[in-house]
Amino acid sequence: DRAAVKLHDIGLQLHRNGAGELGFRVFVGGGMGRTPFIAPVIREFIPVSQYLSYCEAILRVYNRYGRRDNIYKARIKILVHEIGAAEFTRQVETEWALLEPLALDAPAAEYERIKAQFAPPAYDASAPDSIDRSDPDFAVWVDHNIAAHKVPGYAIVTISLKPVGGIPGDASAEQMELIADLAAKYSFDEIRVTHSQNLVLADVRKDQLHALWSALNAADLATPNLDLVTDIIACPGLDYCALANARSIPVAQSIALRFANLDRQHDIGELKIKISGCINACGHHHAGHIGILGVDRKGEESYQLSLGGSGAEDTSLAKILGPGFSEEGVVDAVEKVIEAYRSLRLNPEERFLDAYRRVGAEPFKEAVYG
């Protein structure tokens, strides 16, 4: 799940029913921020042809019963939590029964028009389906930043915008110009932006990967760290945002520098660190394997550490580990958590998140607080 559908007001998950018809599983009432919730399913299947009117029914129920007495509780997730998923579902189904006959959904021609904009490019059926891995640095990048493609001879490339010590998700004008040129040359002129603050070239021939990597590497855009400890998501924080309580970027940079050694990163394995500078959770710290929240403690910047979050199919909300830390202290705490994980894991293949779920928070608390 690349869209964290269970952590939004309305989440739509495409799937097919028993008859093979395409539709959505509907989640409602998720969210992060001040009061995080995982959205429950309110309908297992709604056909694509009817999902707009169903979403309209959701919004009408919220408009009718949602809180207006408290700005912090004026959210769908609060209503679902207060009246319960079953009652909210009943209200939506009742409302939708009135709306569905009104033909509010888009006509089939509109869906076809939109679908045409996402038509697959002109793939070359003769593209070789192998990668020359003789260059060791290139091979490491392939192992970590390349994903399988459904078309033989092609690959999906993630361009990491997380060079060690850099600002997460940041790219210079020159780098963006280069990426645009490379997309035109190697990926049918298309660039996709991910929620993890990286870029994707979705349709690259395997026999052109080395040439692409060479160009990216020369521009410091070939860091092989996708989903590793230095692939950190961070909001702009106090450096740029008037809402923030603490800085996020320097913390991300310090953590990345602490774990700069690639062999160490690869040994740690998949680890998602997410940093928010305030309770609004723009950095998705609730969904981080390790989440960091910046708070104001009597005029001083402080950082709260949470563990065990996930925004994937196995959605979970990270739980606060204990008292907060200074900027330097939180980097030390993260390192202690990671070293505790390395000693606790059953084998190098056991991910941080799986180890945390197996042993719970206590061993990590002991490692951090003594």
Predicted regions located by residue number:
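Peripheral terminal and linker regions in Fe-S/redox and tRNA-modifying enzymes
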Residues: D1-G370
